[in-house]
A protein has these predicted regions:
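Residues forming the flavin
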Residues: 1-184
Length: 184
């Protein structure tokens, strides 16, 4: 009901409306963007790993979207300069590194690391912090209060955070020329 009340002013079912959704974004002082992605009313976060020794999460909703919970990925811009290499597959290596760190932080059991927003905000979430780059943690800490002003309750201290969502966009960039053709 938190999202419905923030968006509609009352639970959607009382108003004859579907579960509310949202899209939030914030541009940090350093220019890095933080945004929600793939909001799932009535959803939950599941492990969607495709490789041994890695944890990646994804959100999902059941058909009726009536579980009483909601989720979305909270993402921040990742730049090619963050990869630490100019290799064409550096983004893939970066993604795999984060997924392996999440696997280790979850006890090597394919359980994703979790914490509350309050714990991450206050630097008391070592499992989650160990599998996120410092720039991502800093960006989330800067953005969350602003996102909470856009959607009341989004930054509640008890909001759950689950790591990591690394598959929202391709880790490989194809360089193109002025005619949008692949460069060789």
């Amino acid at each position: 009901d938190l999202i419905d009340i923030a968006q509609y002013g009352a639970p959607g079912r009382e108003l004859g409306l579907p579960p509310a959704d949202y899209k939030l974004s914030w541009r940090c002082e350093n220019g890095r963007g933080v945004y929600t992605f793939c909001m799932c009313p009535g959803g939950k976060v599941v492990v969607a790993s495709s490789q041994a020794g890695g944890v990646v999460t994804n959100g999902m909703s059941y058909h009726d979207r009536a579980s009483g919970t909601a989720n979305s990925a909270l993402l921040c811009d990742v730049r090619t300069s963050d990869f630490g290499s100019e290799d064409v597959l550096a983004g893939v290596a970066f993604q795999e590194k984060l997924e392996h760190q999440a696997f280790l932080a979850g006890g090597s059991s394919y359980a994703p690391p979790r914490c509350t927003w309050g714990e991450l905000r206050d630097g008391k979430a070592p499992q989650v912090e160990s599998c996120l780059p410092d720039f991502a943690i800093a960006a989330m800490r800067e953005a969350m209060p602003h996102l909470g002003r856009k959607l009341h309750g989004f930054d509640a201290p008890d909001a759950m955070m689950t790591a990591v969502e690394t598959r929202s966009s391709s880790p490989v960039r194809f360089v193109r020329n002025a005619e949008y053709e692949g460069a060789c």
